[in-house]
Amino acid sequence: MRKSIIAKVVTGALVGVLVSACSAEKNTASVDDVEPQPNKAGEVWPKLDIEVKSNATVETKVEEILSTMTIEQKIAQMIQPEIRNITVEDMRKYGFGSYLNGGGAFPNNDKHATPEDWVALAEKLYQASIDDSLDGSTIPTMWGTDAVHGHNNVIGATLFPHNIGLGAANNPELVEKIAHITAKEVMATGIDWVFAPTVAVVRDDRWGRTYESYSEDPAIVREYAASVVKGLQGAADKDFLSDQRVISTVKHF
């Protein structure tokens, strides 16, 4: 019995050596002998046709501003602190490009802060950002928030079903209306920017944030994403980023 087992082990080892030898012989080709593969990125990624066209005047102004900025000012524009970790004086000193309120963050750490409280904080931080007495910059800051199914961090705001429920409706037109209502309420609290829509396509229900996905069907997520962006920002040829709209950021994909 033991001889039989030993024979099988030896045979297996010999086969392994032979396979390795064959593989080594096949892999001796020089890198120079390998034919280069064509770049197929253009076939994989569709060509974008963006409705909001570039504005030459704006682009020129941006270039002018960038040419006068110090490295410290440029770095500050790429930093987004959370409202629990900055003060008005910090904003005046550093001139952060943006800031946010994460989950459980409220003006003055007050869960029951009123819309007026939110506006008051937004105004203080805005005025500090354009004060050039310390950082030499007058670039205005922006406030971003997670308003993914209504302005859900604010007491008294209109809340809608979460994304998984909205996806079950399979109604892009309804979702656009919801996004527009959300934009109005976000603007009413002095906030400029919403981190939505979420375009995660959930396929594994073990994920703890499955409810944030509209659907496991990419087609539904695609339709909804376009509707939410339009609802938040407005149509390119109509009220794009008017005083009833906010900036949208597609996220979590």
Please identify what each model-predicted range represents.
Residues 1-10:
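Bacterial N-terminal signal peptides that target proteins for export
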Residues 23-253:
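Glycoside hydrolase catalytic-domain context in secreted enzymes
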Residues 18-21:
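C-terminal motif of bacterial Sec signal peptides marking the signal peptidase cleavage site
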